Amino acid sequence: MLPCFQLLRIGGGRGGDLYTFHPPAGAGCTYRLGHRADLCDVALRPQQEPGLISGIHAELHAEPRGDDWRVSLEDHSSQGTLVNNVRLPRGHRLELSDGDLLTFGPEGPPGTSPSEFYFMFQQVRVKPQDFAAITIPRSRGEARVGAGFRPMLPSQGAPQRPLSTLSPAPKATLILNSIGSLSKLRPQPLTFSPSWGGPKSLPVPAPPGEVGTTPSAPPQRNRRKSVHRVLAELDDESEPPENPPPVLMERRKKLRVDKAPLTPTGNRRGRPRKYPVSAPVAPPAVGGGEPCAAPCCCLPQEETVAWVQCDGCDVWFHVACVGCSIQAAREADFRCPGCRAGIQT
């Protein structure tokens, strides 16, 4: 980490300029600010009133102090330089502190626009590759090639980007978002560290017809015993339903025995808990299918016909034919007369 000091521009039309200074080790130096780019390290070129900034407007004097720098500001302008809104006498040096506000140009009367060049002074410690710093100052009265702004590049082999491909968003934008303690921020290497993000997989939008529909497994049903409701015929019975309910058709429908989840099979996996469920199904075909197993079927004509399955032989009966109630079938085991006779013998 290198001790540096910065000028962060927070006023004017452009804003966002950040100048980082790192004097040569072991020696003091002077940096100049003004509109003469050939003589100054920081060129201040006003867009509104060019006459308000002198050729060499002010100087920053840096002297080593321990492992840090003592920086003072000296005014050389005809229009004035302000530190914390107090005008600095011409030719007078003032030591700067972290967080001081510097204004280059006259202080306008109340109600007028402020100076274009309004900076905050900061003392920071940064890595060389984090900032492009002004190192060697220009000699007085000379315009040497290579003097002034000289970027501090990372060590050999470290990843870097050319200065011509810098991001349009200046680094100072990150600092402006947290004015409270600018010098205490830990700078992020944005200038020379490439941040190529790999292709991100975006979620594939679902077709319009599938929005809001999620497949779900049919509810678990008891294969041993159930109660059905047979609805009366509808006028539009000829139109098949779009999504038939996944429930057991009546056992008289032999064509769908293999697909009905509640049709009894030869291989039983133990006695499950009895849980009769009522579900609407299509009406039975007249004269077809398996009838009720009761010896004397009363052929119920109600709109809703309830069925119950024997817990012994898995045969289905009309609830009305066996003389029990739906509530009793839910709460206790049901045995048909044949199974009860077999138990007694």
Swiss-Prot record:
The modification Phosphoserine is found at S78. It is found in: Nucleus. InterPro entries: FHA_dom (IPR000253), SMAD_FHA_dom_sf (IPR008984), TCF19 (IPR042803), TCF19_PHD (IPR039095), Zinc_finger_PHD-type_CS (IPR019786), Znf_FYVE_PHD (IPR011011), Znf_PHD (IPR001965), Znf_PHD-finger (IPR019787). Zn(2+) 2 binds at C310, C313, C336, C339. Its main location: nucleus. Disulfide bonds: none annotated. One of its GO terms (molecular function) is zinc ion binding. Coiled coil: none annotated. Residues 147-167, 190-227 are annotated as: Disordered. A zinc finger (PHD-type) spans 293-342. Zn(2+) 1 binds at C296, C298, H318, C321. Gene3D superfamilies: 2.60.200.20, Zinc/RING finger domain, C3HC4 (zinc finger). Residues 31-88 form the FHA domain. Keywords: Metal-binding, Nucleus, Phosphoprotein, Transcription, Transcription regulation, Zinc, Zinc-finger. The keyword Transcription regulation applies. GO terms for cellular component: nucleus. The keyword Transmembrane helix does not apply. It holds the Pfam family FHA. Potential transcription factor that may play a role in the regulation of genes involved in cell cycle G1/S transition. May bind to regulatory elements of genes, including the promoter of the transcription factor FOXO1. This is Transcription factor 19. It comes from Pan troglodytes (Chimpanzee).
